[in-house]
């Protein structure tokens, strides 16, 4: 199955806060996720949501809907887990119906 990567409207603001090295790591991991997004452990409480460790303190959380991989948030560990449900909810309201 071919997956398409999409981004939550707030995601690029998250990227702006990261260092160049962190962004480079994200880009590499994004390609791995695109090839096999289900390889990671499912997040509890988040239907079809998964997490990827970018660094020891930075997490990427994404959501899979059909062939689309929605990048929800990339931020420090605690903030990423605290905010991803809000972004998932807003994504469902705006794009997924």
Task: Annotate each language-model stretch with its function.
Residues 30-54:
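A short, surface-exposed loop/turn module that caps and links secondary-structure elements
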Residues 7-8, 36:
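PIN/NYN-family metal-dependent endoribonuclease catalytic core
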Residues 2-6, 13-17, 57-59, 63-97:
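Enriched for short, Lys/Arg-rich terminal
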